[in-house]
From Swiss-Prot:
ZnF locations on chain (RING-type): 39-85
An example Gene Ontology molecular-function term: ubiquitin-protein transferase activity
Catalytic activity annotation: S-ubiquitinyl-[E2 ubiquitin-conjugating enzyme]-L-cysteine + [acceptor protein]-L-lysine = [E2 ubiquitin-conjugating enzyme]-L-cysteine + N(6)-ubiquitinyl-[acceptor protein]-L-lysine
Function text: E3 ubiquitin protein ligase that is part of an apoptotic signaling pathway activated by endoplasmic reticulum stress. Stimulates the expression of proteins specific of the unfolded protein response (UPR), ubiquitinates BNIP1 and regulates its localization to the mitochondrion and induces calcium release from the endoplasmic reticulum that ultimately leads to cell apoptosis. Plays a role in the maintenance of intestinal homeostasis and clearance of enteric pathogens.
Name assigned to this protein: E3 ubiquitin-protein ligase RNF186
Cross-referenced SMART domains: RING (SM00184)
Pfam family, one: zf-RING_UBOX
Subcellular location(s) of the protein: Endoplasmic reticulum membrane
Major place of residence: endoplasmic reticulum
Domain notes: The RING-type domain is required for ubiquitination.
InterPro entries, sorted: RING_finger_E3_ubiq-ligases, Znf-RING_euk, Znf_RING, Znf_RING/FYVE/PHD, Znf_RING_CS
Organism annotation: Mus musculus
Membrane-crossing segments per the record: 157-177, 179-199
Length: 226
């Protein structure tokens, strides 16, 4: 009478390594090792700089850790295995002369799916996410206020110019030229006054340089954040 023992549960936190044997298309056996693709010493994942190297005891570690463990013993460069303490000779002290763990190198060489990013869409989404709801209203108010100030300055300058012309022209240009110049100055003064009283009549698409500069600065800040 044979008794069967129940399998013991594996404690939590234990890292297991499974080996899968499959029949390849050529009729040969292909062995794939599944485990953590990281060094057992530094716990860093294997990559081009930390290539997995195989010691004589068949234990695998990254090239960086093996280079730190390299020492000279009896005029020979050697590396003690951190697990079993077996010494592996390294010809010339070159870590690259050690064999690579082909199973792990093959898994590292698997192509990863490419992720394509569109900077224009990222900037657009970030700008739309950070732009407040009253963005257009603030821009229109800034444009109207700046245009109003500019029109007032123009009106003051034209008024001063008209006073100067009225005082100087009788002594320099008598006759019809004086009245023509006075009419032109009065017309310009009237137009500037209309602009001051009715700034909404201007096209809202005409933005002043200060508003354009502020908009470009905000867009630059949004792009840098994205």
């Amino acid at each position: 009478m044979s008794c069967t023992e129940a399998p013991q549960p594996i404690p939590a936190g234990t890292t297991t390594t499974s080996t899968i044997i499959a029949l390849g298309p050529t009729g040969r056996l292909s062995i794939s090792v599944e485990g953590d693709l990281e060094c057992l010493v530094c716990r860093e994942p294997y990559n081009c700089a930390r290539s997995p190297k195989l010691l004589s005891c068949q234990h695998t570690f990254c090239a960086v850790c093996l280079k730190l463990l390299l020492y000279v013993q009896e005029d020979t460069w050697s590396i003690p295995c951190p697990l079993c303490r077996k010494v592996t000779a390294v010809p010339g002290g070159l870590i690259c002369s050690l064999r690579d763990q082909e199973a792990m190198v093959g898994r590292l060489a698997l192509p990863c799916p490419e992720v394509r990013l569109c900077p224009q869409r990222l900037v657009g989404s970030a700008a739309s996410a950070t732009r407040p709801a009253n963005w257009t209203g603030e821009e229109e108010q800034d444009t109207v206020s700046v245009n109003r100030v500019a029109a007032r300055r123009l009106a003051v300058h034209l008024l001063l110019l008209a006073l100067v012309i009225v005082l100087i022209l009788p002594f320099i240009y008598p006759g019809v030229i004086r009245w023509v110049l006075a009419f032109v100055i009065a017309l310009a003064l009237l137009m500037s006054t209309l602009f001051c009283c009715h700034p909404q009549s201007q096209n809202s698409n005409w933005l002043c340089p200060r508003t354009l500069f502020c908009r470009e600065q905000k867009q630059t800040q949004i792009t840098s954040i994205a």
